């Protein structure tokens, strides 16, 4: 895959550990040499000294005193960046995804055929034993099965915070995308399935960071997000018409 097309990385953040995020920005800048690293930063006022630390690390920052939500932050930022950059990559701001995996994911887009490249969490064995709780494993497995059954998403890890796409793919998906929160990932994939967007799936070396927890209320909330994603996808016209009796499925063209 060519790597000479403009790349923008987006790290949506809400009250992140500034030291860890600054180090992550520096690592991504060194490893990927992107044209832009942007942090839509919720819960902070303009002029806060923390913003300067992120800028010194190599990022541009758009602060918001309110919590607009992950989906709103990503959609708004992609809308701006997709007019100037050919490739878009988003990663969780806590640095859970390794920079090496981010390099591989970014290399999957920018070719002759526009595509969406998604990661699935692949923790190092020791890190998985240490950091990934039984609750998180059960939740992830159950959510994946529900996403498959309700929305037609066959991906290993729909909620993985590592996804890359061509800017042209973003503009195809954007009109139907409405989710402003953590269900943004699932709605994105559901719309991609309905539209027939080619998708590739790749392992991402992942270490869960302290403070990223699964609330007991999440399964009920996520079910609502899945049903919303299904409704949104049903309104998305496919690239090629399919029989009305046929359920749209996320077409994973390649798996690592």
What are these model-derived regions, one by one?
Residues 1-6, 240-256:
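Terminal disorder- and signal-encoded targeting elements
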Residues 5-11, 25-28, 35-40:
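Hydrophobic targeting segments
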Residues 15-31, 47:
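Short, well-formed alpha-helical segments that are part of the catalytic scaffolds
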Residues 41-49:
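A conserved acidic beta->alpha catalytic loop
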Residues 59-60, 66, 72-76, 80, ...:
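Acceptor/aglycone-binding surface of glycosyltransferases and processive sugar-polymer synthases
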Residues 73-74, 131-234:
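Conserved catalytic loops of nucleotide-sugar-dependent glycosyltransferases that act on lipid-linked
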Residues 85-86, 113-116, 197:
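Short, high-confidence coil segments that cap the C-terminus of an alpha-helix
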Residues 85-96:
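Short beta-strand-to-loop acidic/aromatic patch adjacent to the donor-nucleotide binding site
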């Amino acid at each position: 895959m060519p790597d000479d097309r403009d790349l923008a990385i987006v790290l949506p953040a809400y009250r992140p550990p500034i030291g860890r995020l600054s180090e992550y920005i520096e690592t991504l800048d060194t490893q990927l040499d992107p044209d832009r690293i942007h942090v839509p930063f919720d819960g902070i006022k303009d002029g806060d000294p923390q913003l300067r630390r992120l800028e010194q690390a190599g990022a541009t920052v758009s602060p918001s005193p309110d919590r607009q939500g992950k989906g709103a932050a990503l959609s708004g930022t992609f809308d701006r960046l997709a007019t100037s950059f050919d490739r878009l990559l988003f990663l969780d701001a806590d640095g859970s995804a390794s920079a090496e995996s981010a390099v591989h994911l970014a290399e999957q887009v920018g070719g002759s055929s526009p595509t969406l490249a998604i990661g699935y969490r692949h923790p190092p064995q020791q890190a998985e034993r240490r950091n990934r709780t039984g609750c998180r494993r059960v939740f992830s497995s159950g959510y994946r099965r529900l996403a498959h059954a309700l929305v037609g998403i066959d991906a290993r890890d729909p909620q993985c915070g590592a996804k890359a796409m061509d800017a042209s793919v973003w503009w195809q998906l954007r009109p139907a995308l409405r989710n402003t929160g953590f269900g943004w990932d699932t709605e994105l994939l559901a719309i991609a399935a309905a539209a027939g967007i080619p998708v590739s799936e790749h392992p991402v070396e992942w270490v869960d960071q302290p403070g990223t927890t699964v609330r007991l209320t999440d399964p009920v909330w996520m079910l609502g997000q899945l049903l919303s994603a299904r409704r949104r996808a049903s309104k998305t016209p496919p690239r090629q018409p399919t029989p009305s009796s046929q359920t749209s499925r996320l077409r994973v063209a390649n798996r690592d």
